[in-house]
């Protein structure tokens, strides 16, 4: 009896759980660790390895080829865009290094980037991946929320505040960051004709962005919002901040076609797939005058000299996005299911049906997760309550909602340990560290 009591008192030295509360307790010299804490330690170490992978180039500037190779691991297709971005980013950070280490009469000017491409073609994701690779602060802004100073809406300086916050208020680090301004096409000038009503969310915003795009010492309100005369400001130099502006620029292909003299597609012609395939080739022939005609002001166009065009994603590209990148959606869901001890499989025609749905909705890669969530909802609801589920197969019928996913039951399957509450995990993370 005494031995039984002594055995029962064995506890994990990290989380304090007794031997009866865990599946396995591993003994060391004077200490014990349970299987749950081992699993948590493994997660923390793997997270550190991921950070090291991103920080691989901290001590040196990667070459354009290395940048593209890194992008290839996460972004499917868009080779032309990735090549231009790789060279542009390399030259930008080379310019910063050159400026900081050598004094010369030749001043290298900053070259910001303008990305054009259909919705869901990967504009935002490309910018995010670049920032992760280079380990620099990154912020996303929505151009549609911006207005001229003095009007209801956000001042352009609030974009800089987000970057400062993401750099943990390290101004020197923020000054080498990347800002992605989305929906930039939505601030195009509304009309070529002068108007008595001021265009505060269109041309006015373009004018307001000019200084920070070119490089200036900006005064940023630390709490955001509008500037007040008696408040203190954060001073930040935007000279070395790389601005990437992105937008769908719907309709600009017609302006390009008109300029190059090509015939536009017939009014009633139902050949959208051909048009989608062609749009990337048309966009590659873009010239500054096309942007001017679209409604961007000359001064703004001059401050984003590097133009990157992205292709519309076809069915094959969407299937690759689902399965091939390091963080592909299929891999993410398979990992989620594996945490519950369940194997997840997608049939080939199911993946094709998911891609077809994304094309039908005209959402590109951005809409893939929403489609996946719709398909997986019922299964993900049931799995945690049924320890006998061993495998789930997603079929084309399940994607089209004609049938449910195939669920394979194993009566002999051992019960899966359920994850603990977030608070408990955080406490244990603190103990481990």
Curated annotation (Swiss-Prot):
<dbReference type="GO" id="GO:0051301">
    <property type="term" value="P:cell division"/>
</dbReference>
<dbReference type="GO" id="GO:0051082">
    <property type="term" value="F:unfolded protein binding"/>
</dbReference>
<comment type="subunit">
    <text>Component of the ClpX-ClpP complex. Forms a hexameric ring that, in the presence of ATP, binds to fourteen ClpP subunits assembled into a disk-like structure with a central cavity, resembling the structure of eukaryotic proteasomes.</text>
</comment>
<dbReference type="InterPro" id="IPR027417">
    <property type="entry name" value="P-loop_NTPase"/>
</dbReference>
<dbReference type="InterPro" id="IPR003959">
    <property type="entry name" value="ATPase_AAA_core"/>
</dbReference>
<dbReference type="Pfam" id="PF07724">
    <property type="entry name" value="AAA_2"/>
</dbReference>
<dbReference type="GO" id="GO:0140662">
    <property type="term" value="F:ATP-dependent protein folding chaperone"/>
</dbReference>
<dbReference type="InterPro" id="IPR010603">
    <property type="entry name" value="Znf_CppX_C4"/>
</dbReference>
<dbReference type="InterPro" id="IPR004487">
    <property type="entry name" value="Clp_protease_ATP-bd_su_ClpX"/>
</dbReference>
<dbReference type="InterPro" id="IPR038366">
    <property type="entry name" value="Znf_CppX_C4_sf"/>
</dbReference>
<dbReference type="GO" id="GO:0005524">
    <property type="term" value="F:ATP binding"/>
</dbReference>
<keyword id="KW-0547">Nucleotide-binding</keyword>
<dbReference type="GO" id="GO:0051603">
    <property type="term" value="P:proteolysis involved in protein catabolic process"/>
</dbReference>
<keyword id="KW-0143">Chaperone</keyword>
<keyword id="KW-0067">ATP-binding</keyword>
<dbReference type="GO" id="GO:0016887">
    <property type="term" value="F:ATP hydrolysis activity"/>
</dbReference>
<comment type="function">
    <text>ATP-dependent specificity component of the Clp protease. It directs the protease to specific substrates. Can perform chaperone functions in the absence of ClpP.</text>
</comment>
<dbReference type="Pfam" id="PF06689">
    <property type="entry name" value="zf-C4_ClpX"/>
</dbReference>
<feature type="domain" description="ClpX-type ZB">
    <location>
        <begin position="1"/>
        <end position="53"/>
    </location>
</feature>
<feature type="binding site">
    <location>
        <position position="15"/>
    </location>
    <ligand>
        <name>Zn(2+)</name>
    </ligand>
</feature>
<dbReference type="GO" id="GO:0008270">
    <property type="term" value="F:zinc ion binding"/>
</dbReference>
<feature type="binding site">
    <location>
        <position position="12"/>
    </location>
    <ligand>
        <name>Zn(2+)</name>
    </ligand>
</feature>
<dbReference type="InterPro" id="IPR046425">
    <property type="entry name" value="ClpX_bact"/>
</dbReference>
<feature type="binding site">
    <location>
        <begin position="118"/>
        <end position="125"/>
    </location>
    <ligand>
        <name>ATP</name>
    </ligand>
</feature>
<dbReference type="InterPro" id="IPR003593">
    <property type="entry name" value="AAA+_ATPase"/>
</dbReference>
<feature type="binding site">
    <location>
        <position position="34"/>
    </location>
    <ligand>
        <name>Zn(2+)</name>
    </ligand>
</feature>
<dbReference type="GO" id="GO:0009376">
    <property type="term" value="C:HslUV protease complex"/>
</dbReference>
<protein>
    <recommendedName>
        <fullName>ATP-dependent Clp protease ATP-binding subunit ClpX</fullName>
    </recommendedName>
</protein>
<keyword id="KW-0479">Metal-binding</keyword>
<dbReference type="GO" id="GO:0046983">
    <property type="term" value="F:protein dimerization activity"/>
</dbReference>
<dbReference type="InterPro" id="IPR050052">
    <property type="entry name" value="ATP-dep_Clp_protease_ClpX"/>
</dbReference>
<comment type="similarity">
    <text>Belongs to the ClpX chaperone family.</text>
</comment>
<feature type="binding site">
    <location>
        <position position="37"/>
    </location>
    <ligand>
        <name>Zn(2+)</name>
    </ligand>
</feature>
<dbReference type="Pfam" id="PF10431">
    <property type="entry name" value="ClpB_D2-small"/>
</dbReference>
<dbReference type="InterPro" id="IPR019489">
    <property type="entry name" value="Clp_ATPase_C"/>
</dbReference>
<keyword id="KW-0862">Zinc</keyword>
